[in-house]
C-alpha cells in the first residue's frame, strides 16, 4: 500500500466539520491539514505528527452567559438592575476582566486574508473591531489541486471589492513529499476599477498550550524578543523571519517572508468560568505580517511565505 512508502500524500474532499460543505484534506506521513475553501481558503487544522499536535487547536471568542455577571459586577449593577453580589465580584480572579471580553466574527485559523481599513491598529485587530474591507475571510475561494515536482500545490483564489475596485487574492500552498513545511505564494491583483492603496495581512494562529510558559518564546533574526512570552503583544518592523520556540511540544516553528513586513503579535484569550472563579484563558498566539501596497490598473503584487516546523 502507499502507506508503506515514506513519501505518500493523500488529497480528498471531505466535510470535515459537518457544516454541509466539503473541505480539502491533505494527509502525509508528517501531518495533515484542512482547508476551508468556503471561508476564505483558510486552514482550520494543521497536525504536526512528530509532536502529535494540532497547531490550530484554537477557537473563536464567543459571548457566554456568565459574561453578563462580569460586566454587571464592574458597572455596579446586577443584570436585572440590582447590585452585584459579593459572591459575583469575588469570583473574578483578575481585575478588569470586562476589558478582555472581545468576540470574533470568524474562525481563528491560518492564512486568513485581511484587507485592513486605514485606521486599523494592533488594538483594534486584537479586539476584532477593525475595518475589514472586501470580506475575504468570509467568502468562498475557488480551489484546485496541481501535481508538481516533489509534491502538490493547492491553488486558492477569491475576489472582493476594495472601495469599488475589484481585487483578487490568490494563494498557492505547496506541500512537498517528506517535508512538514508549507510554501505559500500570494498574489494580489488589480482586476478592474481605479488604482488603489491596499493594506494586506494574512493571519496565522498558533495554539501553543501555555501563554506564559518560559519554555515557549517568540524570536526574530536577532534572537528572542525582549517580551517573548505568548501572551505578549506588539509590533515588529522590517521582519523577514519570525518564529516560536516551543519546548513544551519540542517544536520550533518559523515563518519567513520574501518581502520584509511589519508584524503584529497578540494572544487570543477567552474569559472562562472555573470552580475557583472567572479568569482569562490563553487559546492561541496570533501573528499577522502585513504590507501596504499600491496597485495600478492591471497591477500585481506578490509575496512568498514559508512555514517551517522542526523537532527540537
Residue ranges and their predicted role:
Residues 38-64, 69-71, 165-169, 177-221, ...:
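Acidic (Asp/Glu-rich), glycine- and aromatic
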Residues 194-199, 204-265:
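Active-site/ligand-binding surface loops and adjacent short beta/alpha elements
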Residues 24, 42-48, 242-244:
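Short polybasic amphipathic segments
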Residues 25-26, 188:
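Hydrophobic beta-strand positions
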Residues 23-25, 32-34, 199:
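Beta-sheet entry/capping signal
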Amino acid at each position: 500500500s502507499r502507506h508503506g512508502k515514506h513519501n505518500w500524500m493523500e488529497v480528498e474532499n471531505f466535510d470535515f466539520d459537518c457544516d454541509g460543505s466539503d473541505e480539502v484534506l491533505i494527509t502525509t506521513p508528517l501531518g495533515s491539514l484542512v482547508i476551508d475553501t468556503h471561508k476564505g481558503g483558510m486552514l482550520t487544522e494543521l497536525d504536526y505528527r512528530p509532536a502529535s499536535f494540532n497547531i490550530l487547536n484554537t477557537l473563536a471568542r464567543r459571548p457566554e452567559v456568565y459574561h453578563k455577571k462580569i460586566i454587571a459586577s464592574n458597572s455596579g449593577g446586577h443584570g436585572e438592575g440590582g447590585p452585584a453580589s459579593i459572591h459575583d465580584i469575588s469570583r473574578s480572579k483578575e481585575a478588569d476582566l470586562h476589558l478582555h471580553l472581545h468576540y470574533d466574527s470568524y474562525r481563528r485559523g491560518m492564512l486568513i486574508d485581511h484587507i485592513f481599513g486605514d485606521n486599523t491598529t494592533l488594538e483594534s485587530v486584537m479586539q476584532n473591531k477593525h475595518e475589514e474591507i472586501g470580506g475575504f475571510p468570509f467568502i468562498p475561494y475557488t480551489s484546485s489541486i496541481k501535481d508538481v515536482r516533489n509534491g502538490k500545490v493547492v491553488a486558492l483564489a477569491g475576489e472582493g471589492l476594495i472601495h469599488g475596485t475589484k481585487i483578487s487574492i490568490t494563494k498557492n500552498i505547496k506541500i512537498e513529499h517528506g517535508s512538514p513545511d508549507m510554501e505559500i505564494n500570494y498574489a494580489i491583483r488589480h482586476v478592474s476599477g481605479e488604482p488603489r492603496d491596499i493594506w494586506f495581512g494574512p493571519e496565522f494562529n498558533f495554539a501553543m498550550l501555555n501563554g506564559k510558559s518560559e519554555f515557549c518564546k517568540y524570536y526574530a533574526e536577532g534572537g528572542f524578543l525582549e517580551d517573548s512570552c505568548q501572551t505578549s503583544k506588539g509590533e515588529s518592523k522590517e521582519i523577514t523571519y519570525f518564529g516560536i520556540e516551543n519546548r513544551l511540544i519540542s517544536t520550533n516553528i518559523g515563518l519567513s517572508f520574501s518581502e520584509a513586513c511589519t508584524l503584529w503579535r497578540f494572544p487570543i484569550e477567552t474569559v472562562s468560568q472555573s470552580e475557583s472563579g472567572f479568569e482569562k484563558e490563553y487559546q492561541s498566539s496570533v501573528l499577522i505580517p502585513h504590507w501596504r501596497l499600491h496597485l495600478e490598473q492591471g497591477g500585481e503584487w506578490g509575496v512568498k511565505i514559508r512555514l517551517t516546523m522542526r523537532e527540537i
